[in-house]
From Swiss-Prot:
Keywords: Isomerase, Magnesium, Metal-binding, Phosphoprotein. Its cofactor is Mg(2+). This is Phosphoglucosamine mutase. The active site is at S102. It comes from Rhizobium leguminosarum bv. trifolii (strain WSM2304).
Amino acid sequence: MKRRYFGTDGIRGQSNVFPMTPDLAMRVGIAAGTIFRRGNHRHRVVIGKDTRLSGYMLENAMVAGFTAAGLDAFILGPIPTPAVAMLTRSLRCDIGVMISASHNPYEDNGIKLFGPDGYKLSDDLEAEIEDLLEKDLNAQLAKSDDIGRAKRVDGVHDRYIEHAKRTLPRDVTLQGLRIAIDCANGAAYKVAPAVLWELGAEVVTIGNEPNGTNINLNCGSTSPVALQKKVDEVRADIGIALDGDADRVIIVDENGSIVDGDQLMAVIAESWAESQQLRGNGIVATVMSNLGLERFLDDRGMALARTRVGDRYVVEHMRQHNYNVGGEQSGHIVLSDYGTTGDGLVAALQILAAVKRTGRTVSEVCRRFEPVPQLLRNVRISGGKPLEDIQVQKAIADAEAELAKNGRLVIRPSGTEPLIRVMAEGDDRAQIERIVNELIGTISNVRTAA
């Protein structure tokens, strides 16, 4: 069933434009609060956010919704998404909320929901919430003497800082490392530099002056040029780029080269396999991860299990099949020994541990495999279902037959934007470029005709 509000990572859209309005945010609070208002205990919700201008508006709306449903609201302020997931569990809350649009520009915002176990909600639970949103919610309001209380909670940043520090192996210190970190003017602008400094590193920070409108603006994991310049300028050993809510990370090595999530997963998998920490004899990634990663793992007797795009689906597969490492090429790295969702800072600490233990440079540690040529392009759509068109389906089948075992083809609608994503990879770069361009042309022609 097609969902009206929830995409692959919660509800997301332009702020003050449906569905990302304060009215809907309040209704989500009432609906979600109703579903998680089970048992006779006093029910609680934690609400965090990143640094977007619209975050204050949506935070107030969600507090109103949850308290109207009878839940006490613990307001955390700007804090990373993985911290919200952690605090949902440690504060014994019934539900957790992160108000963020992750790596998107400040004009957008979103709502991510976590269950009492700290994991993102399942499709079924999101469907229940959507079903309630279509109904009259007045019947779900708490009685006057059961309305929830709201309060801002102090000290939660320190809890997350200590949690992150504990994920670095005890035999490792960051002393002697000069680290440049880009906090994307986002949720981790205070906690991430503090963690690195307290672990002994010399820290140079950029992207730590949020003003409500500069989150992810020419900074962070989706725009690492500023970090590359800073690494060169200060001669840093490593650069760490987080995104707006700090659930993803990209590394810059000492030469200024980008290290993506696939390479980071390879480093962690190999390191954890050597220390016998790795479970499942492999890792979980999505269909977008490079074929080179799959070959790298296979050569070392490890498996790569693939899921649909979205870190929540990676996590679901990890839980079902007892893996403890998973992630996405974009830098969502999930380490279930330490958390229930992607955590850019914790993932970076595992890379730093590998660097310190080996005594090698970041470029030597993080270049684990040669990626096969991969090309990803997007086609913007305004409606219709071009992937159901006969011409498009034939073009896809022809391309898959041509690639055969020498490459892969992934074509899918974006779960967060009105786009069709076309990705192909294989050993022959010219062939890949031709296939992608032909498919883009076919999809565009169908879209135009529609």
